[in-house]
Amino acid sequence: MKSKKQTKLLLILDGWGYSETIQNNAIALANTPVWDKLNQTFLHSLIHTSGKDVGLPGKQMGNSEVGHLNLGAGRIVKQDFTRIYNELQNGDFFRNPILKNSLEYANDNNKAVHIMGLLSDGGVHSHEEQIHAMLEMTHKQGCKNVYLHLFTDGRDCAQKSAEKYIQKFEEKMAILGTGEIVSIIGRYFSMDRDNRWSRIRCAYELIAKGKAKFLAQSALHAVELAYARGETDEFIQSTSIKIPISIKKGDVLIFMNYRADRARQITRAFTDENLQGFSRGTFVPTQFICLTEYKKDFNLPVAYPSSKLNNVLGKYLSNLGMTQLRIAETEKYAHVTFFLNGGVEQAFNGEDRILIPSPDVATYDLQPEMSAFELTDALIESIESQKYDLIICNFANTDMVGHSGKLNATIKAVETIDSCLGIIHKAMFAISGEILITADHGNAEQMINPKTHEVHTAHTNNPVPLIFVSERKADISEPEKGALSDIAPTLLAMMDIEKPNEMTGNSLLTFK
């Protein structure tokens, strides 16, 4: 008979930030008796999740990919955004061999160059400066037919901000005398990650075939028409500009998003000959270029390949023969697996995974509970089994509902999490387990932009809570100075395991 484990649990409350402002703060306005009691009873602090603390430039807000990479790595991980940003500054971007070769191929074979990506300064999935730079590169290389397929944001920036990004881009095109915006579509369709292939199909048919729901005379006109229909940027329906343009066999298609999770499905639509999600009709092969590595087994040219992270938390525990569980609903499953494991897709030895399907609704404000209760049921069963040394669980609600910008729905999401926390605490107390509660970034604590007074749907730069739920006596080593890179060393300290040399983060707990 296997011995029962003294399970440690890391709870990641996605998008649960901290702000002293009460107004428009869904977390402060919610009824959270369990959360309040945990804060009153147990050791707690705040940690940092944005900018240089997580390997991003300056004051760039954090996000789930960046957060989970840092959580699992136990060190500050220099992000793709930062790598590319630095190369834009020193000019190396324009010498990137993969990008240069693709443009040379287009010139030599009289092929068009298509550039697609999310046009905003949100910095979570892409950045407008990088798309501007790609356009400049086509100009420097003398490319003739350069077509832009732009995704509008409205989620990692203001809901109706597309016009300013498009105006800047059109000014860049005018200066260079290169490029033509031929299609516009909201990220809701082009960047799905939850196998809602009907959305991806809308984007694919627009970009590949020029088949659109609407026709506009310019990109700005497309946005104007969308607003008149009551759509915000995230939800702009497929629109062709002037004359529909289709992709021809052998054309170059460069995808300028750098974050993997929302890039995978649309990439598969263009590159997977055996695509199961929807019928494309005749498959048209392209010279598809990924800005970063979206998935190893895609076997596609990558401008900025991933660098390997050694001795991340999951691998380190696996090498020690320990057992671990990763559990989340669909929307955050990749984060507690792929990203937390440093970009490794396959589970490590001794690592189990449980995926709880996210509800099939258009937007999560329609069901703010999401699948939190089903997730909690599965988590409780795993806790009671006492077969795991470490369980890592992500609750998606405060981030996914927070992105809707709907305050009342987000309050409901917070209260759902609070109910689940009560059940989880009881189960962990029964087995004498310990819980570390934190978040990957803020979101739900700021539902209105305090400067513009517009609905705020993006992440924040606010710190996030840290609570150590245990009967054990401990102190916070450096109150309010910690970062996400300190979480893995903290978990190892809770398990009485020395951290590996690669982990430069430090335990936030000192045990008495």
Curated annotation (Swiss-Prot):
Mn(2+) 1 binds at residues 399, 403, 459. Pathway: Carbohydrate degradation; glycolysis; pyruvate from D-glyceraldehyde 3-phosphate: step 3/5. GO terms for biological process: glucose catabolic process; glycolytic process. It catalyses: (2R)-2-phosphoglycerate = (2R)-3-phosphoglycerate. HAMAP family: GpmI. Monomer. This is 2,3-bisphosphoglycerate-independent phosphoglycerate mutase. It comes from Ruthia magnifica subsp. Calyptogena magnifica.
